[in-house]
Amino acid sequence: MNILPYRIIINRHLYANRDIQYFNINIPKFFANYKYFKIILKDVSCDNRSQDVWLNCDALTYNQVSQHTDPAIRGIFLEKFLFNLTAFREGGSQSHYVILPYRDTLKFWITNIMGAKPGMDCTVVMILEIEPYDI
């Protein structure tokens, strides 16, 4: 049975005036067999095209990966990511991903707070893929 890639669909509604939505993603126990795993932001849609929206994973320090270069090759293991979902959906990036040591739960938040424009109602749908990562 091939379960890879493991896909997660996130659907969140953000309200006007700067909303933050928190949610957890449980990582399947299958990934405990690997020391690291990769989370990839595959697709984003938003019903309000003028709204800036950000996705964050609460792990450790800020970083944004927008290159195809594999950070593990440089010996860097990213422990947090902050993605501008607006730039992603408008073709501003070809690859958004983070490599993390295995853990069973990740806490995320999505917000319209950090955008330059005031917060407006919007519904955001994201597709995340999780796959094992071997160095």
Language model feature labels by segment:
Residues 1-135:
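Flexible assembly/topogenesis modules
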